[in-house]
Amino acid sequence: MNYLEFEVIWGVNNIYSILELNSKLIYEGIFKGKVLETGCKEYSPLVPGDIVLGYIYSSRKVYIDKRLSRKNILWRYNKKADLRQTIVSNIDNVLIVSSANFPEMKNFFIDRVLIVAEEQNIVPIIVINKIDKGISQKAQEFSEIYENLGYKVLKTSVKTYEGIKEVKEVLKNSRTSFIGQSGVGKSSLINLIDSRASQSVNEISHKYSRGKHTTVYSISFHSDSGIIVDTPGIKEFGIETLPFENLKYYFKEFENFASFCKYKSCLHVSEPYCSVTSSLDNGISKLRYESYLKILSELKNYKNYAR
């Protein structure tokens, strides 16, 4: 058998659209057996960005035999399955798209994605979209907080084209996933960058009887700007399987203060002689600290439940 390498573009019901890396031809891929052996229990054995080994068994049809190692994954907690659910793999950047006004910016959502990005060595970029409709006080405040922490923040509008050039610069020669809650204009932003994205989404939506212009599955496509992965609008981005003891390491503003805490195991909550809590509003934003406490509580509750 002549094994070839393929990149997963999208998939549903264990049927995948895969790109042969040499010829750049698209094939339909299925597992040789009932499931793909990956060596661990997981919700999504294959996602856009995965590289797989397979062989052609019929015209434009491939048996997928093996998934190659992933350099990283963008994941969230799937409560129903009680597992990490991989959304996309092998990416360089994640663009976290939020709205400047409505729907209201969800900083807790952004912070959770930032944590996973930091954990997986993915470069996060925060995009505040729909700025032609004005920017809320909350969005402006968090924009400044994130910029002060060193995160790149882009402000965009698909109507005035503001910030679109900067987004294209981020995409150049890289693999980038767009993620955001429903209604923030994520897919409209991608469609402005490359109209072929909308065509791809609509073809899949029509095939599986979904509404038009609705991303229901993660889908990867090669644009002139770079490789883009569009993802479904996500209501919640849980990270419950992250060990709660590690959470503090993903809030970069704690770094310069934590070394002065009396106790090495300090979680920066109510411990005595905590340099982090004594630095609130003096280098550490209270709003970000509130986010830390909320996420820490969720992680602790999950660990207690799991026991």
From Swiss-Prot:
Subcellular localization(s) per the UniProt record: Cytoplasm
One GO term (biological process): ribosomal small subunit biogenesis
CC annotations in GO: cytoplasm
Chief localization: cytoplasm
Superkingdom assignment: Bacteria
Residues annotated for Zn(2+) binding in this entry: C261, C266, H268, C274
UniProt remark on cofactor binding: Binds 1 zinc ion per subunit.
Domain CP-type G: 80-237
Enzyme class: hydrolase
The protein's Enzyme Commission number: 3.6.1.-
Entry GO MF terms: GTP binding; GTPase activity; metal ion binding; rRNA binding
Cofactor: Zn(2+)
Sites where the protein binds GTP: N129, K130, I131, D132, G180, Q181, S182, G183, V184, G185, K186, S187, S188
InterPro entries in the record: G_CP_dom, P-loop_NTPase, Ribosome_biogen_GTPase_RsgA, RsgA_GTPase_dom
Record keywords: Cytoplasm, GTP-binding, Hydrolase, Metal-binding, Nucleotide-binding, Ribosome biogenesis, RNA-binding, rRNA-binding, Zinc
PANTHER family per UniProt: SMALL RIBOSOMAL SUBUNIT BIOGENESIS GTPASE RSGA, SMALL RIBOSOMAL SUBUNIT BIOGENESIS GTPASE RSGA 1, MITOCHONDRIAL-RELATED
The protein's role, per its UniProt record: One of several proteins that assist in the late maturation steps of the functional core of the 30S ribosomal subunit. Helps release RbfA from mature subunits. May play a role in the assembly of ribosomal proteins into the subunit. Circularly permuted GTPase that catalyzes slow GTP hydrolysis, GTPase activity is stimulated by the 30S ribosomal subunit.
Family of the protein in this entry: Belongs to the TRAFAC class YlqF/YawG GTPase family. RsgA subfamily.
Subunit record text: Monomer. Associates with 30S ribosomal subunit, binds 16S rRNA.
UniProt protein name: Small ribosomal subunit biogenesis GTPase RsgA
Organism ancestry: Bacteria, Pseudomonadati, Spirochaetota, Spirochaetia, Spirochaetales
